[in-house]
A protein has these predicted regions:
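Transmembrane alpha-helices and adjacent helix-loop boundaries
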Residues: 1-214
Length: 214
């Protein structure tokens, strides 16, 4: 008699590899997009502010599952773009995380005392130099807890990609369950696998927070 707790592990390990790939690449792109959008939300240029705000509100106002289906099926139908599943998944995570990171960036920058900008001007720095050398380093330190939480949220959101048959952890577990007709063991081990990833991530985040005293 097979031990399904053990037998399912190779399937889930394959899923973890893809889960981590999508998460790291997607969140990295999302951070760049979020930083640009967050600064756009602080811009005095109405066009830049408007574009950034529309993007953030659309993403935050719609479920990520809808975003996944729209990117994978909707764009293919509308524009004739045949995205492969992994590319579509990375785009979805990047766009979703980017919107939330934009608000983290906006809040982090706004949390810095305005006197810091005045100090930059008194030193002869341009607004962009003040942002780069004075505001941004301080703001980034304050953003770390929220950015870490967003990474964990995005990691867990990858489970939704099973709806487009991306071979991440949940999909692999479901495939095993459907072929062996056992459900408790695979889904229990799926939960364990997510905890194996997220608990160390949370511990690392707390360690960084303590080191930086944020």
């Amino acid at each position: 008699m097979s031990n399904h707790f053990i037998d399912v592990i190779p399937y889930l390990i394959e899923g973890i590899k893809l889960t981590l790939l999508i998460t790291f690449v997607g969140v990295a792109i999302g951070f760049v997009l979020g930083a640009i959008t967050g600064l756009g939300r602080l811009s005095k240029n109405k066009l830049i502010y408007g574009i950034a705000t529309v993007y953030v509100e659309i993403i935050r106002g719609t479920p990520i599952l809808v975003q996944i289906l729209f990117i994978y099926f909707g764009l293919s139908d509308l524009m004739g773009i045949n995205l492969d599943k992994i590319t579509a998944s990375i785009i979805a995570i990047a766009l979703n995380a980017g919107a939330y990171i934009a608000e983290i960036v906006r809040g982090g920058v706004q949390s810095i005392d305005k006197g810091q900008r005045e100090a930059g001007r008194s030193l002869g720095l341009t607004p962009s130099q003040t942002m780069r050398y004075i505001i941004w380093p301080q703001a980034l330190k304050r953003m770390i807890p929220a950015l870490g939480n967003q990474f964990i949220i995005s990691l867990k959101d990858t489970s939704l990609f099973s709806v487009i048959a991306v071979g991440e952890v949940l999909y692999q577990g479901r495939q095993y369950a459907s072929t062996t007709f056992t459900y408790f063991e695979p889904f229990f081990m799926i939960a364990v696998m997510y905890l194996i990833i997220t608990i160390p991530a949370m511990l690392i985040l707390r360690y960084i927070e303590r080191r930086l005293d944020v």
